[in-house]
Amino acid sequence: MSDPVIKRALVSVSDKTGIVEFCRELSGMGVEIFSTGGTLKSLQDSGVSASSISTITGFPEIMDGRVKTLHPKIHGGLLAVRENPEHVKQATENGISFIDLVVVNLYPFEATVARPDVTFEDAIENIDIGGPSMLRSAAKNNESVTVVTDSADYALVLQEMREHNGATKRTTRLTLALKVFELTSRYDRAIASYLAGAVAGEQQGAASKMTVTLERELDMRYGENPHQSAGLYRLTDENGTRSFGDFFEKLHGKELSYNNMLDIAAAVSLIEEFRGEEPTVVIVKHTNPCGVAQAPTLAEAYRRAFSTDTQAPFGGIISFNRPLDMEAAKAVNEIFTEILIAPAFEDGVLEMLMKKKDRRLVLQTNALPKGGWEFKSTPFGMLVQERDSKIVAKEDLTVVTKRQPTEEEIADLMFAWKICKHIKSNTILYVKNRQTYGVGAGQMSRVDSSKIARWKASEVSLDLHGSVVASDAFFPFADGLLAAAEAGVTAVIQPGGSIRDNEVIEAADANNLAMVFTGMRHFKH
């Protein structure tokens, strides 16, 4: 069959970007336009000739607009096969006219449920019924009907209509139909995820079923290694939709890689532990923090974080909890770093940093969401757990030794505990004056992690006397604690819970250490 000429269009959009201009062009080509509610008003107010959908259905919009396009004269006009004589006969007998073009986008359900103040009633009212129905009918009959869901496609449709005497090409109609089913499937999954979250709110633990939608946001050259394909996907689950662009904007530098994304997630997750606190700097390498410090100025915090490990920061990722000022930027600029992440860049800083073309500069535009689910793929299924976002306050600490920690020790212990949960297990972390002094990460033995942390401190001549130590899980034996005491530690923070806790406490008392239990483990695999 020849490509059908577009004579009648049905237009109903929530996102009115470019719709007036598009419909004005359609009208100029002789297309008869029918519309609904706010879209009709926008067109008529702009002087575009358009009629109410009620002139087709002979029925008013009712129930606060919930019922307006669910009618045989609409769906018959969309679904009728033009080459089928029986369809044409039935359409004629029932006063149904063909509709050649459908321009519809859906109620903004995902944006609505992403609002922190959204109510269940608001969410339900933003579930579109008529829109998906029209889109699916039009897309099913793509032999005859052109269907548009995205304002970015308006120009393509107009161009083809001009070049083909008012018609669109078959390949274009098929491509646009594909976009419909991708859109409606994602839309339905978002609704199902939200409702699953509502049900889960009445339940304990993870739901028996979860609906998760992944939509590619960014292509990547490769994954962790050049032989691995990769991409970044926008994720929609019961907590709404999350994407890189919701929280970050790359201002300068090469495209972000798979490994860059992992490091950004690690660096920002840690720096947000210190949101609103004194100037803090986090340096990350291969997702592990290699230096973290607080100080009166950002520049001083950076220098102190860098002094923890003066080799690892080269090619690393640095995040800041304050706008990056010129003094700190000049200090950072002395070495090559892959990525700098800040909530803002003060005047002149970007211009200076952009002189190194390969360095990525990333603006954090919003805080990362707290809580929700964390997904980890395995060859045999998907592991799902709550994010490790619970906070331990000073009031939650239980002092288990004879000696109480001093206020200065408590400040260092709390600082260390915030960092500890962001380091790969087994973790031993030494901290002094709100600066990491030795990081022992990712070892199979807690004793080995302790040895590495002490060795790293000695490599840069950091004196551990007067420091505190944090362990992400309990000390199974007293040996790890005794090694810390030998290094000069005065206070310890750990979850507790070992069957040998009493032995560890006795060892702490024997060495005049103050030790607190958090009652919360922070394994990180």
Swiss-Prot record:
One of its GO terms (cellular component) is cytosol. It catalyses: (6R)-10-formyltetrahydrofolate + 5-amino-1-(5-phospho-beta-D-ribosyl)imidazole-4-carboxamide = 5-formamido-1-(5-phospho-D-ribosyl)imidazole-4-carboxamide + (6S)-5,6,7,8-tetrahydrofolate; IMP + H2O = 5-formamido-1-(5-phospho-D-ribosyl)imidazole-4-carboxamide. The IMP cyclohydrolase activity resides in the N-terminal region. It comes from Pelodictyon phaeoclathratiforme (strain DSM 5477 / BU-1). One of its GO terms (biological process) is 'de novo' IMP biosynthetic process. Residues 1-149 form the MGS-like domain. PANTHER family: BIFUNCTIONAL PURINE BIOSYNTHESIS PROTEIN ATIC (PTHR11692:SF0), BIFUNCTIONAL PURINE BIOSYNTHESIS PROTEIN PURH (PTHR11692). Its EC number is 2.1.2.3, 3.5.4.10. GO terms for molecular function: IMP cyclohydrolase activity; phosphoribosylaminoimidazolecarboxamide formyltransferase activity. Gene3D superfamilies: 3.40.140.20, Methylglyoxal synthase-like domain (3.40.50.1380). It comes from the Bacteria. This is Bifunctional purine biosynthesis protein PurH. Belongs to the PurH family. Keywords: Hydrolase, Multifunctional enzyme, Purine biosynthesis, Transferase. Pfam families: AICARFT_IMPCHas, MGS. HAMAP family: PurH.
